[in-house]
Each structure stands twice: as structure tokens, then as C-alpha cells.
């Protein structure tokens, strides 16, 4: 009998960061195995500053490995080479080819995350031969006093941002959000952002780790903690307008707030005011999901991906054909079972079960016809992510913004930047399969 593709889990990979903590190990129960130069494996302890858990990544060196089943030991890139559109769906494969289009992480932001920004697909492709980086943060937990900085609290200029980053006063113009469990933030390319104070995040993004670091809270002045900054490279890709409040969702939404924020996908305009300055609407809406009684709230629907929050109170019958894409589920609370209708060699039908618990991620290949989602705990919450082929480039970049600032010596920068990208010994760029900056 021909073996069929099945829901896939991958071995998580830890990434130590100066702003990381212990929540990925202590709260989510992650077990990170690391190998030394001799191939000896050890368990990474909770005493390490682990900032990221890479759950699903097709990033060259960072290539996720299947954890279970008959495909165990194969990487996601090997699966893409072998199964092509059976993994991601025909339309997605037609656009992205053998590159798996999304990157899934958990973040433990225990200290100040650098003030940073990501490019869009157009800039990333033209300058660095990479995908851009649109992303959504889903807040799984937040300590009292935790902060997210997203965009600016007023319109500013490139010159003001440049000066403030150099002077260490940029915090004064950053828009501050005090996150709570269940909140969601869509970080569009060009949005300057940072965070601090104990935040556990599920992050869904394009398959790119390209980050421009603008300010590092003083770490850059200490030789022991200094990391490269990319302010010059990023100055013309930043959205300098005041933060668009429609990109942040307080969760859960109830009553008047939910009604105010609801928006129909097919409508050209909504009541939230997000179109007043010509920005695209990313408002959140409730929708029926499949044929069950559950409700999926769409957190973001953008050209690159669509992410919904699914409060799983009853079993749901999911048909993958509806999405035309693979489906990724991230369990942020409780536990669930993916039950796949299967047939034994003797022709008898049965359900094959695949469990997903809090802090786990599963990839459902597009080739699977249908399956059931069954909650195992009373309060089970899943994030559901599917991919949309990109049809239009991001439009936030103002073509009139000067790429260079007065009084600064940029001689040779434009010509030298392309050369720098290919020489890691003379540049802050780090290579992980594609040319990119590292956060």
C-alpha cells in the first residue's frame, strides 16, 4: 500500500539571544538537544538565555527535521524537493517553488529586544535576493509591566529617527503597547518594533530572517555586548507614520469593541478608519469554521499568509481543498487531536490520531483530503496559518523619501553594499542559506 503524507511535527531548534530567558524550557517544556564539535549530544539547560525556538524553518543551515513517523529524519527542504506541490499546494508551489514559504518560531522576550525593522518582498529581492518579512506576534503570556514598541506615537521624519537612534532617545517616539495573553500584533514590513519585560510569543512570518537593527538599548556601546547596527541600510524602508491601531488586537474581543473592529474581507472599506490614510485593512473578523460549531477569528489576512485564532470547543471536520494550501496549527493553550480517516490493508476504515499540545506545531500537507480537529482540553486554542501566493508588492514605501541623510558620508555605500553582502568578514550580514541580516 502506498504511503501517504501525514501531519508532520519537527524537532525544535534553540537560538540563544541576549534578550532570551527560560520560558521556552520551563513553560512550554521544550527539550533542545545540541551537539558539540565531536558529535556529543547534550540537553540545553534552562540556565541559558534561549530567545527563540525554531519550530518549522526552511532556511538553509536552519532546516527543520521531521520528528515522527516514516518520514522522521528528513528535512523540510528534502520533503519539498520530493513532494513539491503535495506539501504546499499547487498555487503556492507555482509562486514559491521549492522554498517553504513560512517560518514558525516561539519567542521568549525576557529582556529588551533591539529596535528593529524588516523589509518587504520588493526591497529584499532587489537588494539581498531574499524574501521580505511580514510577521504576526500572538501573545501566549505577558508579565506585568511588559511592553511592545510598535511604530511611532506620531508622524516623524527619517532625519529625526536617525538622530534619535544615534543619541539614544528613540524610545520617546515609539508607540507603546502593554500586551496581555491572547493579544495579537501584525508587524508589517517597515514597522519599527521592539519589546521588553517577559513576553512569550508565537511568531508566524515569511520564510526570511532578514532584520535591520536600528538601536540596541546601549548594548552597542559595550564591546562585550555590541552587535552590528543597520541604520544606514534601513533608512529608506521605514514607515514613518504614526502606528496604525488596526494592526493590534486585544483578545478576546467582545461586545462593542468586537463590532467596531469587525470587517468583511470582500468590502472595499470598513468602519474602523484604517483606510483614511490609504492603508490596507487588516481588521479582525469572526467567521464560521468548516462544518463544526467552533469560531475562527481571522487575526490577519495579507498577501503572504492568513492566520486565524481557533477556540476549539467542539470537533471540527476540516477539508484542505478549501484552503488550497498546507495548514499549520500552533497550539497556544490546551491540547487537541488531529484525526485522519485512513484505511487498513484489509480495507477497514479507521482514524489515525496525531496529538498536538501547548507549545507544539504541526504541518498538515496540502495533499491530505480531510481530517478532524478534536479538543483534548476544555480550553484549547490553536493558531491556524495558511499561505497565499503574493500577487502585489507591498506599498508602504514612500518613493519621495530620501535614501540618504544630510551631513552623513555615504560615498561608495550604494556600490559597496552589494559587495558587502557577499563578504561576511567585512559586514554585519550573517548567512543562513540566503543573504540576510540576523535579529
Q: Language-model segments: which ranges?
A:
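His/acidic/aromatic-lined binding-pocket segments of jelly-roll/cupin-type domains
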Residues: 104, 113, 135-138, 176-177, ...
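Loop-centered beta-sheet repeat module
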Residues: 165-214
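Short beta-strand/loop turn elements enriched in aromatics
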Residues: 139-161, 296-299, 314-327
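Ligand-binding loop in jelly-roll beta-barrel domains
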Residues: 99, 107-112, 121, 142-145, ...
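Short beta-strand segments in beta-sandwich/barrel cores
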Residues: 317-318, 334-340
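Edge strands and adjacent loops of beta-rich recognition modules
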Residues: 288-293, 297-307
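Short acidic-glycine-tyrosine-enriched beta hairpin
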Residues: 174-186, 341-368
